[in-house]
Regions:
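Short, low-complexity N-terminal intrinsically disordered segments enriched in polar/charged residues
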Residues: 1-39, 43, 51
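Short linear sequence motifs
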Residues: 27-31, 83, 96, 119
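Unusually extended, aromatic-enriched hydrophobic runs near protein termini
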Residues: 24-25, 49, 143-147
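Short solvent-exposed beta->alpha transition segments
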Residues: 47-107
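Intrinsically disordered, low-complexity segments enriched in polar/charged residues with Gly/Pro
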Residues: 26-27, 74-75, 131-132
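Exposed beta-sheet edge and beta->alpha loop/turn motif
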Residues: 89-147
């Protein structure tokens, strides 16, 4: 009987560990999506950016901002994330918020700070989904994201 209890406790521990790991990886998945969007922006790929921002292409103001950002912030160099402040960090269930990201492409160019509208759907422990809705024009280095 004791072996069954130990076995059950081990299985319970493994199941809980797996669920916690899934919850914690949601942060990495969000960050990867935002960084992919920034890479497209740095490469000047506004069409790729619009594919990552569902609904933005149908909104003239959003579409124009994305095209202008991609054109203005395009450049060579290696993208480096200097600071990443997620508005949805460690959300267990769905959440929406602004993620503030400061990034640099090296060289003499100044750092860029932008806000990305992020939505998490579903439960993080079951994978959930990460949806990016919009990216702001560059904001001041000490500015906060709206909302």
């Amino acid at each position: 009987m004791r072996i069954w209890r130990v076995g059950l406790l081990i299985l319970l521990f493994l199941a809980v560990s797996f669920l916690i790991a899934r919850w914690l990886t949601a942060e990495n998945r969000e960050r990867a999506a935002v960084v992919s969007l920034l890479h497209l922006q740095k490469e000047g790929d506004s069409a790729g950016m619009l594919r990552m921002l569902p609904g933005c292409g149908q909104q003239p103001k959003c579409r124009a901002a994305v095209v202008a950002d991609a054109r203005r912030l395009q450049g060579a160099g290696t993208l480096t994330v200097l600071r990443y402040d997620s508005g949805t960090s460690y959300s267990f269930a769905g959440a929406s918020g602004q993620t503030r990201v400061a990034w640099d492409r090296g060289g003499a160019t100044p750092a860029v700070v932008q806000c990305v509208s992020v939505e998490r759907r579903g439960l993080a422990i079951f994978g959930g989904s990460i949806i990016l809705h919009a990216i702001s024009l560059p904001i001041g280095g000490e500015s906060t994201c709206p909302g």
